[in-house]
Amino acid sequence: MQQSQREAALAVHAVLDGAALPAALEAHVGRDAGPARAFVQELAYGTLRHHGTLDAIVRAMIDRPIPDRRIAVLVEVALYQLEHTRQPPFAVVDQAVAAAAALANPGAKSLVNALLRRFLRERADVLARVHADPVARWSHPRWWIARL
């Protein structure tokens, strides 16, 4: 799962920088990875689908931006797993911490661990604050929500 989280985070990071997701997945996973590619693809598509909400969750739990955008995206991938998959929370957190060590400096591990564990402890409160904003709740731009 650690490698899957890391690959999904790198693919999502590439998309946020302007790449197409299929090309980003091919670059980070390859074409013939079988079930592993399917899992990474699910994580990447799901994270992008809920990016507005996941980003708002991260912003609600930390006062300043995470310096390394890859780590911020990795946290979003792990939050997606915690909220939208049936994977055990302890496994998601553990693997995200290991993936952070592979992606960035060792200090990133403690940041990822702290954010994810805080989310698990304060889930209801954090989600209530985030869902109060329709942009975060629906993961759509404010202008689009205003038109609806």
Where are these regions (language model features)?
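Class I Rossmann-like S-adenosyl-L-methionine
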Residues: M1-L148
